[in-house]
Amino acid sequence: MIKIPKIGFVSLGCPKNLVDSERIITKLKAEGYDLVDSYDNADMVIVNTCGFLNSAIDESLEVIGEAIAENGKVLVTGCLGNKADLIKEKHSEVLSITGPQDYENLIEAVHTHAPIFVNDFVSLVPPQGIKLTPRHYSYLKISEGCNNTCTFCIIPDIRGKLKSRSIDNIMKEAEKLKNAGVKELLVISQDTSAYGVDIKYKSGIWNDKEYQSNILDLATALGDLDMWTRLHYVYPYPHVDKIVPLMAQGKILPYLDVPLQHSSPEVLKRMKRPAHTQKTLDRINKWRDICPDITIRSTFIVGFPGETEADFEHLLDFAEKAQLDRVGCFKYSEVEGAKANQFDNLISEEVKQQRLDEFMGLQAQISADKLQRFVGTEQQVIIDVINKDENYAIGRTKYDAPEVDGQVIIGDALERNLKVGEFATVEITESTEYDLIAD
């Protein structure tokens, strides 16, 4: 009897890395490998690493060590794979190291260390591939790499320059996901609004219609699928204004994830980010004029080298004026290889924490005030979790992305016959700083 090798798999890092993991697992399943969820049952373990922040590097190295201790046969891939010397220094027992999207060499290493002799299993893989997210939503990665030169970031060094997929290729995947039961698409890349620049917006055919490989045509085509479509990592370029009418028309969700990072022109210049604060505020107001329903999410960094008290006050003032709906904030930390590491005037950890607390305290109040408007209204939600023991469900409105935004806590889930992955209409009875409650 032929023994089918069993592969353990650990996926670390961001949603883009999760998509890479899905592609690797799909390839392994197509060749007949079994995927298992524990180290001790596996013949070998693959760790798909993150190598962006120092904390992510530490986590990746720790997980690699755990896999070696528990299993002994470990392959490493992903962003940290670009630092093979570091991995070998810490864990010389690692069998193979490959970088991000280096699927061919990773699979070759799997063949070497866990050979398989039965490889006609393509029919066992669903058309949409293997997904690691819940069945009802999926990340849709439209490009790799980035052409920006932000001083705090090393993504171009890790993943290379922008490499966009053709629009017809993306739409074929999106259609497969819909046919598989996916109801929400989360469009991701390093810079979604730059999609297609590198391939000169080349045209493609989908459903007998010609589209250009640009973000407007892509959003238009995705809107025709009649799914929840959510755009992430969108820089506030002028052409984004053309997408917002699609949100007002209900074609795609009224949601934009715009990573602004700061508001102070001086800080933004040091970050090598767009530094036109008033233009950004004007653009946000324009979006709200076009689509009053729009939810704008952003992320910020406090404590960047050289950030003065005046710079931080500028950020607080911007938060008051912008009234953003969803906000995340991080203390600046060095990333090995980033240009910002050479900057002077470092901010102490104590000051970073104080600024983080003050900024998020302000944003919590803004969020609480904005969520109050939902009390007494009916909202459509998609159900993510059912807790049968305590008889409640967790869902999300169209204004909230999974994992990073707020939730709707719904009582009497069993009596309502709520089901994970299905839509329901609920009445909002309370709101908190970040979440809504429905009875």
From Swiss-Prot:
Binding site for [4Fe-4S] cluster 2: 146, 150, 153
Primary localization: cytoplasm
UniProt domain Radical SAM core: residue ranges: 132-369
Protein EC: 2.8.4.4
Residues annotated to bind [4Fe-4S] cluster 1: 14, 50, 79
GO biological process: tRNA modification
PROSITE patterns: MTTASE_N (PS51449), MTTASE_RADICAL (PS01278), RADICAL_SAM (PS51918), TRAM (PS50926)
NCBIfam families per the UniProt record, alphabetical: 30S ribosomal protein S12 methylthiotransferase RimO, MiaB/RimO family radical SAM methylthiotransferase
The protein's name: Ribosomal protein uS12 methylthiotransferase RimO
Native species: Francisella philomiragia subsp. philomiragia (strain ATCC 25017 / CCUG 19701 / FSC 153 / O#319-036)
Name of the gene: rimO
